[in-house]
Amino acid sequence: MVSRVAEVAVVGAGYVGLVTGASLVRIGHRVTYVDKDGERVAGLRDGRMPVYEPGLEELVARGTGAGRLSFTEDLDAAVGRADVVFIAVDTPQGDDGAADLSNVSAVARGIGRALTGSARRERPLVVANKSTVPVGSGDYVSTVIREGAEEAGGLDPSEEVRFGVASNPEFLREGSAVYDSLFPDRIVVGAEEAWVVEVMRGLYGPVIEQSFPVEMDPRPRVTVPFVVTDLASAEMIKYAANAFLATKVSFINEISDLCELTGADVGSVATGIGLDGRIGPRFLNAGIGWGGSCLPKDVSALRAIACEHHHDTNLLDATVAVNDRRRGLVVSKLRRDLGTLGGKRVALLGLAFKPNTDDLREAPSLGIAAELLSLGAGVVGYDPVAAKTAARQVPGLRVVFDPYEALTGAHAAVVVTDWEEVRNLDLRRAASLMQEPKLLVDGRNAMDPAAARGAGLLYRGFGRG
């Protein structure tokens, strides 16, 4: 088992890598971030964050100031002094829907090379995969590490153990990732060797035992389950978890459509079924569907794995089909009350795929904005952190940083992302700024329908009769 204070290298200073490393520093370890992007490394050294995540910038600054967190482009040096190396690089979706492992492969090969020559080591190294990868990738990473070592001169056969591979999937929610890292529902570690599991158990000991100091009382967790399994099962857990969450959202959205047809209220239905312990209340918010960097990519990758094994994915296919229809429903609701969209002004309230992040990957706002623009509408978008990036991605989209500026002169507004600034809008002020019919399409069911109508808005939600 590693000592209480471990030397950790995190390869990939992106969203997952930054949160992982900063959280490990928070519980007492020393972390070196490794990234091949020199500009990113220089920016991080100067305190510039490449991603927006509440609490992350402060956590990184705290670790850097304490001398426990550093940044480098030198993989060899970082591997040479590490007890554990995390692979936390992007695995983008390929044209066939499968995860592209080229970044993971490049890092694994580099680790293998670093295990030879000047980086020869007396203690074994754990290589833990944080990247979301297909089932079987743990064995693949091990093979590529050995190939890299052989290319650089080979591993010394006289040494009993040089490295071991673990799968340690992340379950971070954008917008609350720091919290999720320190107070997780569970920690999953897949490995084929007992010593690898014990190294990871020691690394996460302060989180498992909740023994690190915190400012809150009481703690959100007493202890954290440490789930030990084989490599393949750990890799499948990640995909299965996200696919299930996507399916749950698509299910309630299907029910919301039926609620509109029958006069039922999907909020009441969600409350009624969510109190069943077998179902639970989370991910039962009807609206314009799921997006982001994880659910779409992971559902697609799981379908690709099934296709590779000649297995049908009828449920996942339906999950995706239901979600794909949601954006079109927004446009349909606008057309129903505005008639032609040509010459109409529409305000999009929120552009990121969810609150408290600047992530626009698979964000519903982008497709909605593009379709409205193609139909001749003028579209202005508001988002407190993602506006500038959205404007670069959607030609013709005008962005502002004040929701009331977005609403000024708008015939309709669409709640796309339920930021606190959007949920807490002064609805009477909003109505006073808009043009008739003062339509509010609530894509997140975030507003009180009675309050909206009382303020003079024409309210349209999802599944609310």
Role assignments for model-derived ranges:
Residues 1-465:
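Structural/interface elements that position substrates and couple domains in central-metabolism enzymes
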